[in-house]
């Protein structure tokens, strides 16, 4: 008669080994099924080629979204500035009002162009909502790889600029390998330049 203590289960005395085996199998099965259900609920990780393709499509979508936002900004700016009355005798900082209104219209188009990528990223994320967490996790891991392998900015000079510091041109595994080679070549060039002095 052995006292057995398990989490949530206390049996003081077992009368037969059959009861012990039954309890042991029950606890083992509960543990097995619970871990299997956890494994099944966990989503599959994105592989690197898929992540890099999604990253490229996001970048293209952000750039293309800048076009309608720039046109919208230009349209709103022209609707506001170019419909106002202009007094030809009034000047601000030596410029007549019509010139300032044209500058304001162009600036509102530029503001629309600058807002385009952030709006495009939000829309793209909503379109790929099912993979948003996986993409965010891969993005963090990708950034850690970049930080670990890229050149320190102290080595930069005008004659030897750092190649693709933020990894914006990496859209495939071959691009990533090329980026790594460029970083190593940059370090070698910087080393030879400093050692020859």
From Swiss-Prot:
Residues 84-96 are mitochondrial intermembrane. It is a multi-pass membrane protein. The chain crosses the membrane at residues 63-83, 97-117. Keywords: Membrane, Mitochondrion, Mitochondrion inner membrane, Protein transport, Transit peptide, Translocation, Transmembrane, Transmembrane helix, Transport. It comes from the Eukaryota. It is found in: Mitochondrion inner membrane. Residues 34-62, 118-197 are mitochondrial matrix. Residues 1-33 form a transit peptide. Pfam families: Pam17 (PF08566). One of its GO terms (biological process) is protein import into mitochondrial matrix. Component of the PAM complex, a complex required for the translocation of transit peptide-containing proteins from the inner membrane into the mitochondrial matrix in an ATP-dependent manner. Component of the PAM complex, at least composed of mtHsp70 (ssc1), mge1, tim44, pam16, pam17 and pam18. Belongs to the PAM17 family. This is Presequence translocated-associated motor subunit pam17, mitochondrial. It comes from Schizosaccharomyces pombe (strain 972 / ATCC 24843). The lineage of its organism: Eukaryota, Fungi, Dikarya, Ascomycota, Taphrinomycotina.
């Amino acid at each position: 008669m052995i006292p057995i203590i398990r989490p949530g289960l206390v049996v003081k005395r077992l009368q037969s080994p059959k009861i012990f085996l039954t309890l042991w199998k029950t606890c083992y099965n509960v543990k097995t099924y619970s871990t299997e259900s956890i494994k099944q609920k966990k989503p599959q990780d994105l592989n690197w080629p898929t992540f890099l393709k999604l990253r490229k499509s996001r970048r293209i979508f952000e750039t293309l979204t800048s076009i309608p936002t720039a046109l919208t900004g230009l349209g709103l700016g022209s609707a506001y500035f170019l419909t106002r009355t202009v007094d030809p005798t009034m000047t601000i900082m030596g410029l007549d009002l019509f010139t300032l209104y044209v500058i304001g219209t162009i600036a509102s188009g530029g503001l629309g162009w600058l807002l385009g990528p952030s709006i495009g990223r939000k829309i793209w994320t909503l379109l790929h909502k099912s993979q948003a967490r996986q993409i965010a996790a891969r993005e963090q891991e990708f950034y850690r790889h970049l930080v670990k392998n890229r050149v320190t900015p102290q080595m930069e000079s005008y004659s030897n600029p750092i190649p693709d510091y933020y990894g914006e041109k990496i859209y495939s595994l071959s691009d990533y390998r090329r980026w790594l080679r460029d970083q190593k070549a940059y370090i070698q060039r910087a080393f030879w330049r400093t050692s020859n002095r």
